[in-house]
């Protein structure tokens, strides 16, 4: 065995020891081509999702928090945003989208191509655009040696009955497109 092979074996052994010292973690940075069943279920419930697109004017990342999100399948996610949102114009210029979610004790980055399904949802008082993301890659991006103790939550700051009614209308509308 050559000198370089010995160093490689020592490095692998070192990495495994570090992994066990820090109590696990995602040393492999697992990459999947589709959503897991757990992520599909999470993306069918109310949750906070970060959406990253490329700003069409500045060509820098643009990140927004959204909650009207629904996973149709392991390969398709829909979300709704105000039609004036920068996300809409960004996707018109560049279809690349990254959705980030904190769930299942970790942080996941979901990359894909976004397509505007409708510029304005029918039957909803707000002017909402629906975008569908075709999932291309799912990465567990949680830093090594840690897990999420709790998932982020939020509270609605407007009329709860009106919010529930609107949320239901948007969810049904996204599914039916």
PLM feature spans:
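Binding-site signature for planar aromatic cofactors or substrates
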Residues: 6-177
